[in-house]
């Protein structure tokens, strides 16, 4: 009798651990590290903090308007590189600078008269495109959470040096 009771307990224990392992496996499959990293990058780019404004202001000559003058982008590039770290490829950072994404977002903040904070950020995997996500968010003013703009775009992730990094970013304002 004892051996049969032991077998039932052992079988129950094995089934329990198999169920726990299955739950962990399913949870791991559901988690998408590329998407999490993409969300971080988009959040950082859309956040118009005072540090971003200062870096943009330092890059643009006094009296010029965003997008119309040559800017000293070295300081802004160094700032973004420090802010995003290993989250973007060097080529992607070059494209972000060439497309003036930080200055476009800062210009929106200037128009609203307040710092902007992204809210309701959603990322959705693009059908048929591996590691490409469509995103959308509302940019709210920091003071009273008034909607200042609706933004959308895409972000494509690649695995480089064992880490997920943004390879391309588009932004529609």
Question: What are the roles of these predicted feature ranges?
Answer:
Residues 1-45:
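Gram-positive cell-envelope targeting signals
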Residues 20, 56-60, 130-131:
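Short amphipathic alpha-helical segments, especially helix-boundary/capping motifs
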Residues 33-110:
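Core segments of small alpha/beta cavity-forming domains
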Residues 38-42, 139, 166:
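Generic alpha-helical hydrophobic packing signal
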Residues 73-88, 117-126, 140, 172:
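Short, Lys/Arg-enriched charge-dense amphipathic segments
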Residues 103-145:
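Surface-exposed, charged secondary-structure patches
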Residues 148-173:
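Short beta-strand edge/turn micro-motifs at domain boundaries
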């Amino acid at each position: 009798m004892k051996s049969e009771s032991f077998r039932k307990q052992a079988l129950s224990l094995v089934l329990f651990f198999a169920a726990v392992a299955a739950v962990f496996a399913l949870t791991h499959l559901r988690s998408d590290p590329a998407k999490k990293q993409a969300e971080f990058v988009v959040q950082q780019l859309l956040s118009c903090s005072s540090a971003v404004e200062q870096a943009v202001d330092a890059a643009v000559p006094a009296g010029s308007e965003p997008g119309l003058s040559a800017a000293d982008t070295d300081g802004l590039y160094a700032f973004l590189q420090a802010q995003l770290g290993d989250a973007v490829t060097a080529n992607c950072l070059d494209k972000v600078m060439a497309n003036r994404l930080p200055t476009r977002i800062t210009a929106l903040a200037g128009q609203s008269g307040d710092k902007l904070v992204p809210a309701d950020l959603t990322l959705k995997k693009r059908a048929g495109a591996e590691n490409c996500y469509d995103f959308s968010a509302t940019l709210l003013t920091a003071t009273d959470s008034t909607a200042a703009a609706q933004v959308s775009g895409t972000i494509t992730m690649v695995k480089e040096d064992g880490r997920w990094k943004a390879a391309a970013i588009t932004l529609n304002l």
